[in-house]
Swiss-Prot record:
Family membership: Belongs to the serpin family.
Gene3D superfamilies hit by this protein: Alpha-1-antitrypsin, domain 1, Antithrombin, subunit I, domain 2, Serpins superfamily
Organism: Rattus norvegicus (Rat)
Keyword presence, Phosphoprotein: no
SUPFAM superfamilies with a match to the protein in the record: Serpins
Protein's UniProt name: Serpin A11
Subcellular location: Secreted
Matches recorded under Pfam families: Serpin
Positions of glycan attachment: N106, N169, N350, N385
Sequence segments annotated as region (Disordered): 25-45
Secretion signal, residue range per the UniProt entry: 1-24
Amino acid sequence: MGPVWLWLLIAELLLPVHYQPSSAHGDKSLGAPQPASHQSLEPAPAYHKVTPTITNFALRLYKQLAEEIPGNILFSPVSLSSTVALLSLGAHADTQAQILQSLGFNLTETPAADIHRGFQSLLHTLDLPSPKLELKLGHSLFLDRQLKPQQRFLDSAKELYGALAFSANFTEAAATGQQINDLVRKQTYGQVVGCLPEFDRDTLMVLLNYIFFKAKWKHPFDRYQTRKQESFFVDQRLQLRIPMMRQKEMHRFLYDQEASCTVLQIEYSGTALLLLVLPDPGKMQQVEAALQPETLRRWGQRFLPSLLDLHLPRFSVSATYNLEEILPLVGLSSLFDVEADLSGIMGQLNKTVSRVSHKAVVDMNEKGTEAAAASGLLSQPPSLNMTSAPHAHFNRPFLLLLWEVTTQSLLFLGKVVNPAAG
């Protein structure tokens, strides 16, 4: 018999951005974690104990991926970190501490129980219904039908992470794989398909996480302004001709001389915003090295609103990773260590994680704007000189950070090197 496998499977989806009439609500948070305010006597929500750590972990993981992968990068920090934290519920003694510390938590300052309650609060808040933002997260456990999982683990996983458990027959690998892929396809409305790679007949458990995001721009792009063929410079040798959305609109942005990049904040309706980082030509590595929580906070304090001539690619990008080789490089080696104690999941049958599969999809466009052709949402003040507006032309590789504002949580982090790669 071959090795017994435990799998973590994470699937993410950021769906097309549609038209939404502009609302009258005020400016949102700037999209980077800000110091907590102590003016209110009400206790801070429990998710405040985990969201800064999720961001720190995401930046560490991104830098490691950037060293290994020359092309597009996309992953969901909330999805991946919550899945790893859920798994730690089944770890005992040193293994649990090592997993949580590897995510970046200081267990002296934030005990394990507070961490799990923080994730519970975060997932619950993100899952609250919103008329302007569709955000759906979920965890599912597929356990071999011959196993007798620990009831305490199943109860805690359901209570804290909303994880549902299903019995599976892994000896029928093809049928079970189809069952899991069908669930992902259903929960992501058919947008993420075939996310589960082939697994061994000796697999015992698949831990699945998915996140589905769909939102509308606060200031939509007019599809009639989109140029079907505009240059995008992947590098000094490769130039593409791609659809480029165009807009002159009020946005918050800045130029960071120290990092050599332009940073733009684009708001969605509802409680989400997108941070786009455009390095100067040849400065991508310099910008990536500067990606620190302090940098995000500094940007958040320096944004200024201005009329902007914006050119942004219309693109769809997907990324699939097997992270079992990457996660140990950011400290999560204990998940894969043969000495790891995960007996809290299945009692005496203690096995390590063999595979962490992660798939993310982002699709950004101006779809739906034709429904608002008469709404006049290019609402620049008439006194502004449109010809003198500063410009941000995303015609070369750039970074994207998608935030949920209420929780200050980083939903997606990525790099678009080739917007035509699909």
